[in-house]
Each structure stands twice: as structure tokens, then as C-alpha cells.
Amino acid sequence: MSRKCPLTGKRPRRGNSYTIRGIAKKKKGIGLKVTGKTPRRFFPNMITKRLWSTEENKFLKLKISTSALRLIDKLGLEKVIARAKSKGL
């Protein structure tokens, strides 16, 4: 399965992991300095969830992001699926 949410379109993002050293200025030091930078990926918080669809009258097993789960709580499953289909997700 891909790491893309089918309802919100969230997917992994790119970024950097920074290595720092030194003593913070709050602790009477000279400050923190960046000594290295490593590429990394930020993954969306994905969960596998069984959701009841009232239109189809059955459970749907979806791998969705937690933000999509909050959206389903707010709007309802059918509205969120209709919105995703209209956006082409």
C-alpha cells in the first residue's frame, strides 16, 4: 500500500534532520551550532480503520491519515468520500 491518504491526499514530505552541539545561551553558553544536516522524510500519520458506510450498508476498510479521521467525525464519511472523488483523489 502507498503512504498516500486517499481522502486528504497527504503524502510523505521531504526535509532535513539537523545535528546540533554547544551550550544554549540560556545556560550561559555561546549558543547552539548546526554541525550536520541529513535528508529525511516526514510521513503522514496513517492508520487502518474499519468505517461503516450507510449508503453501501457495509464496513469499508480504509488506510487513512488521522486528519482524515477527524474530517470524517466532523462531516461524515459519505461527504468526505464525495469530496475526495470530486478532487480526483
Swiss-Prot record:
Transmembrane segments: none
InterPro entries attached to this UniProt entry: Ribosomal_bL28, Ribosomal_bL28/bL31-like_sf, Ribosomal_bL28_bact-type, Ribosomal_bL28_sf
SUPFAM superfamilies listed in its UniProt record: L28p-like
Protein origin, superkingdom: Bacteria
UniProt-listed GO biological process terms: translation
HAMAP family, A to Z: Ribosomal_bL28
The protein, known as: Large ribosomal subunit protein bL28
Species, as recorded: Chlamydia caviae (strain ATCC VR-813 / DSM 19441 / 03DC25 / GPIC) (Chlamydophila caviae)
Organism placement in taxonomy: Bacteria, Pseudomonadati, Chlamydiota, Chlamydiia, Chlamydiales
Gene: rpmB
